[in-house]
């Protein structure tokens, strides 16, 4: 694809991307919400989670279009789910789970993600990866998105379960 882009062959590139997109859709056509951007991120992350033997439970009630920028959707869902998957990897396979709840009412969007984890505490929410220079920026990015929408975010360690709860304000349904 990079070659086609550098060559400037946009029409062939569009065709190539269209075929690739069709193939991805055939692989996982799951709909988790009415929002195609959220679903795209969720399909990718849920697919990765299931490949790790993680049980997934979703309850998502958000509209097809809302006043939340696409990039912010990727940052919010992507980083939080990456962290949940990482925590689940450290747990025995039969205990691995991620629960995603998401709803939009009266201009407020609530996103709650719970996941299994070891009993170990990580009070500072710092990365546990050995290469902490390249990792650990996700929570900072998530906080920026939450602040952008005048929201709040809480991280709760419940022992062998971790919960992130984010509330964003001013998220209206687009017509």
Residue ranges and their predicted role:
Residues 107-140, 175:
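Glycine-rich/acidic phosphate-handling loop/turn and adjacent ATP-lid/helix
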Residues 150-160:
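Glycine-rich ATP-binding loops of the HATPase_c
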Residues 119, 158-165, 171:
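Glycine-rich nucleotide-binding loop
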Residues 93-107:
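Short beta-strand/loop element within the Bergerat-fold HATPase_c
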């Amino acid at each position: 694809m990079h070659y086609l882009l550098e060559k400037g062959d946009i029409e062939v590139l569009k065709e190539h991307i269209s075929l690739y997109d069709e193939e991805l859709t055939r692989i996982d056509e799951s709909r988790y919400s009415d929002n195609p951007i959220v679903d795209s991120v969720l399909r990718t992350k849920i697919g990765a989670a299931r490949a790790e033997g993680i049980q997934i439970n979703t309850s998502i009630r958000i509209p097809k279009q809302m006043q939340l920028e696409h990039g912010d959707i990727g940052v919010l869902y992507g980083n939080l789910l990456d962290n949940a998957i990482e925590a689940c990897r450290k747990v025995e396979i039969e205990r691995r789970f991620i629960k995603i709840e998401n709803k939009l009412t009266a201009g407020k969007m609530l996103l709650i993600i719970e996941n299994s984890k070891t009993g170990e505490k990580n009070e500072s929410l710092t990365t546990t990866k050995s290469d902490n220079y390249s990792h650990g920026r996700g929570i900072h990015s998530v906080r920026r998105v939450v602040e952008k929408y005048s929201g709040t975010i809480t991280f709760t360690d419940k022992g062998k379960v971790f919960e992130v709860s984010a509330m964003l304000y001013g998220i209206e349904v687009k017509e």
